[in-house]
């Protein structure tokens, strides 16, 4: 499955033209810049939202199909009782970042990592190596305690098996 197809499925659109019409874009059926800008948040699992006068976490969460808890997690340095019009918030969507039913690619892995880091800012990322093709080998970390556990996935020849198991596990752990 292509990334565009995943984003369209998450948007509930049958094809690009339907999505473009719904978004008020010219329905060309092509992956143009404006269309991809609107589809990208659906892949990342969150959107950047500019606060408007009268907004509350509850109103924003309800309008976007998410929870106040998810917004609090994604915006740890924001005071939910002091929203200032014009400031930006990360608003997680009400679905998991990590798709459970699509084949993983290096590109999809990096998109999932980006989304997880924003939705769960207590996670951190480090590039520990590069593949022969120059792609990053990413390590994700949660917590800072004295105990350490390593879970390994997305390594050569097994990424299609291990990544779809480990990443949803990490997302469930982070959201707990």
Please tell me what each predicted stretch does:
Residues 2, 10-14, 18-176:
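M14 metallocarboxypeptidase catalytic domain recognition
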């Amino acid at each position: 499955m292509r990334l565009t197809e995943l984003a369209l499925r998450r948007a509930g659109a049958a094809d690009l033209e339907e999505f473009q019409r719904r978004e008020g874009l010219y329905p060309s059926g092509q992956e143009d810049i404006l269309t991809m800008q609107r589809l990208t948040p659906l892949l990342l699992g969150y959107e950047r939202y500019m606060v408007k006068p009268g907004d509350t976490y509850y109103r924003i969460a309800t309008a976007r199909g998410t929870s106040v808890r998810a917004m609090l997690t994604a915006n740890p340095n924001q005071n939910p009782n002091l929203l200032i019009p014009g400031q930006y918030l990360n608003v997680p969507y009400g679905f998991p970042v990590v798709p459970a039913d699509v084949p993983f690619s290096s590109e999809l892995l990096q998109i999932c990592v980006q989304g997880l880091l924003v939705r769960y800012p207590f996670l951190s990322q480090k590039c520990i190596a590069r593949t022969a093709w120059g792609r990053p080998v990413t390590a994700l970390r949660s917590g800072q305690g004295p105990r350490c556990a390593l879970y390994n996935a997305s390594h050569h020849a097994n990424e299609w098996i291990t990544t779809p198991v480990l990443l949803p596990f990490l997302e469930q752990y982070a959201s707990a």
